[in-house]
Swiss-Prot record:
SUPFAM superfamilies, per database record: FAH, Fumarylacetoacetate hydrolase, FAH, N-terminal domain
Implicated disorder: Tyrosinemia 1: An inborn error of metabolism characterized by elevations of tyrosine in the blood and urine, and hepatorenal manifestations. Typical features include hepatic necrosis, renal tubular injury, episodic weakness, self-mutilation, and seizures. Renal tubular dysfunction is associated with phosphate loss and hypophosphataemic rickets. Progressive liver disease can lead to the development of hepatocellular carcinoma. Dietary treatment with restriction of tyrosine and phenylalanine alleviates the rickets, but liver transplantation has so far been the only definite treatment.
Residue numbers bearing the Phosphotyrosine modification: Y395
Residues that hold Mg(2+) according to the record: D233, K253, T257
Entry protein name: Fumarylacetoacetase
Reaction(s) this enzyme catalyzes, per UniProt: 4-fumarylacetoacetate + H2O = acetoacetate + fumarate + H(+)
Active site: H133
Organism: Homo sapiens
């Protein structure tokens, strides 16, 4: 239990302690903090208290504007920091609890802080690891018998996304312009995307990387995963449909990707590990680990249109539905010798479950625009309208506490039409 008051339904109890980067009006310098209840503990203020065997030599990582340096230190440093912070914030520990002056400087209300991207993202890769999502899309665009492509059950399919347009929660997303072909019998046209979609995803940040040419074996993959965030991989379905052959997504994806600001460490999630769905056929040996696991993370997508007093829940899903694991994704990414670096972002792909209410995109929820999604108050959607705000939340439910991720939110702005 922490000496900082934490509500039972708070995302950020002492069991969590996610890392983020924030600034305040009084101090606009981006710096690293840890969320506890509705407060932020400013690690740049207390960095001198990290006196363990690893962090005593690396206190300066908490004086950086991003988490990259801390991510790169590896598991020993992360575990040392977590144990120290849980002890420091404990109701029984006087060091910070009873130091009135230090507490005054070190704690900031989350409501008064501006959040930033947690890391400088050198590279961003998006996977396609939900079997239900891949099957749904395959049925819509091909047929039931050929829903999954021949490679899908043998490797975690992915593509390289655009790191420069990954933004933190709360950043508006402008409706993209692009080339589309709405009528197969007519030439393509240029204009504003009409089929704008959201995608419910999660992503993880890479910790220590690997040298070019040296793959990461699956037995060591967990050592390279720092923590997880929520993600909305905004998608322009009409632009994507016309452009994606033969090289895959490009402008239909690269206009914006939203992530939540707080990175939940893997040690906070391990109590919620569950067996991974059975993989059949058995993957090749380099993708096999002894006890494949995933995480029981409850996920929701809410949509609030202009004029709506309350957001409508359009999707309830769970990360445990994913087919390919994070360890397999990271291992496969490096198997050809590709070098990963601290702060790289690897995303799950759309998270869809077995029931229609578990579908993680409007493409699926509206079944390619044929079934309007009821928002209540007489409003429906097939795809996103200007002014719509999409809010993704997620948490693991413990006994009397929850490990939450905060919000991953973004509002759609109108396209910038050519003059």
């Amino acid at each position: 239990m922490s000496f900082i008051p934490v509500a039972e339904d708070s995302d950020f109890p002492i069991h969590n302690l996610p890392y983020g980067v924030f600034s305040t009006r009084g101090d606009p310098r981006p710096r690293i903090g840890v969320a506890i209840g509705d407060q932020i503990l400013d690690l740049s203020i207390i960095k001198h208290l990290f006196t363990g065997p690893v962090l005593s030599k690396h206190q300066d990582v908490f004086n950086q504007p991003t988490l990259n340096s801390f991510m790169g230190l590896g598991q020993a440093a992360w575990k040392e920091a977590r144990v120290f912070l849980q002890n420091l914030l404990s109701v029984s520990q006087a060091r910070l609890r009873d130091d009135t002056e230090l507490r005054k400087c070190a704690f900031i209300s989350q409501a008064s802080a501006t959040m930033h991207l947690p890391a400088t993202i050198g590279d961003y890769t998006d996977f396609y690891s939900s079997r239900q999502h891949a099957t749904n899309v395959g049925i819509m665009f091909r047929d039931k018998e050929n829903a999954l492509m021949p490679n899908w059950l043998h490797l975690p399919v992915g593509y390289h996304g655009r790191a420069s347009s990954v933004v933190v929660s709360g950043t508006p997303i402008r409706r993209p312009m692009g080339q589309m072909k709405p009528d197969d019998s007519k030439p393509p046209v240029y204009g504003a995307c009409k089929l704008l979609d959201m995608e419910l995803e999660m992503a993880f940040f890479v910790g220590p990387g690997n040298r070019l040419g040296e793959p990461i074996p699956i037995s060591k993959a967990h050592e390279h995963i720092f923590g997880m965030v929520l993600m909305n991989d905004w998608s322009a379905r009409d632009i994507q449909k016309w452009e994606y052959v033969p090289l895959g997504p490009f402008l239909g994806k690269s206009f914006g990707t939203t992530v939540s600001p707080w990175v939940v460490p893997m040690d906070a999630l391990m109590p919620f590990a569950v067996p991974n769905p059975k993989q059949d056929p058995r993957p090749l040996p380099y993708l096999c680990h002894d006890e494949p696991y995933t995480f029981d993370i409850n996920l929701s997508v809410n949509l609030k249109g202009e004029g709506m007093s309350q957001a409508a829940t359009i999707c309830k899903s769970n990360f445990k539905y994913m087919y390919w694991t994070m360890l397999q994704q990271l291992t496969h990414h490096s198997v050809n010798g590709c070098n990963l670096r601290p702060g790289d972002l690897l995303a799950s792909g759309t998270i869809s479950g077995p029931e229609p209410e578990n579908f993680g995109s409007m493409l699926e929820l509206s079944w390619k625009g044929t079934k309007p999604i009821d928002l209540g108050n007489g409003q429906t959607r097939k795809f996103l309208l200007d002014g719509d705000e999409v809010i993704i939340t997620g948490y693991c439910q413990g006994d009397g506490y929850r490990i939450g991720f905060g919000q991953c939110a973004g509002k759609v702005l109108p396209a910038l039409l050519p003059s």
